Curated annotation (Swiss-Prot):
Oligomer status and interactors: Homotrimer; associates with NifD.
Coiled coil: none
Task performed by this protein: May protect the nitrogenase Fe-Mo protein from oxidative damage.
Family: Belongs to the NifW family.
GO BP: any one term: nitrogen fixation
Top-level taxonomic group: Bacteria
InterPro entries in alphabetical order: NifW
The entry's keywords: Nitrogen fixation
Lineage start: Bacteria, Bacillati, Cyanobacteriota, Cyanophyceae, Oscillatoriophycideae
Protein name: Nitrogenase-stabilizing/protective protein NifW
Recorded name of the encoding gene: nifW
Length: 110
């Protein structure tokens, strides 16, 4: 539980490790170093959803939901790769200025 924590304290956090410590979530530092941006991006998306779905909950309830969201974001990358989740724009758009071998074969009529 995060009852002793305040929403003001939460808003001052910046690092993945700070969020994990704030919510008393056990974590592997090496895993976080490798997946930091993806965990934080997923966490950001999940807290946006919490704020949208539960706009009128107390700060304590909101922090509890945020704790669950961070746990979910952290656990997601234990079973999925960043490439599979495609959180960032670079993974969502097809690369530009690339000629695929299949396209060359089709054009050549081979």
């Amino acid at each position: 539980m995060v009852a002793e924590k305040t929403f003001t304290e939460f808003t001052k956090l910046t690092d993945a490790e700070d969020f994990l410590k704030f919510f008393n979530i056990d974590y592997d530092a090496t895993f976080v170093n490798v997946n930091r941006l993806h965990i934080l991006k997923q966490f950001s998306l999940l807290i946006q959803e919490v704020d949208k779905v539960f706009p009128d909950v107390s700060e304590t309830e909101k922090l509890e939901k945020y704790q669950l969201a961070l746990t979910e974001a952290y656990e997601l990358f234990k079973t999925s790769s960043p490439l599979e989740t495609k959180l960032f724009k670079v993974f969502q758009e097809p690369p530009k200025n690339i000629v695929l071998l299949d396209d060359l074969v089709k054009e050549a009529g081979v």
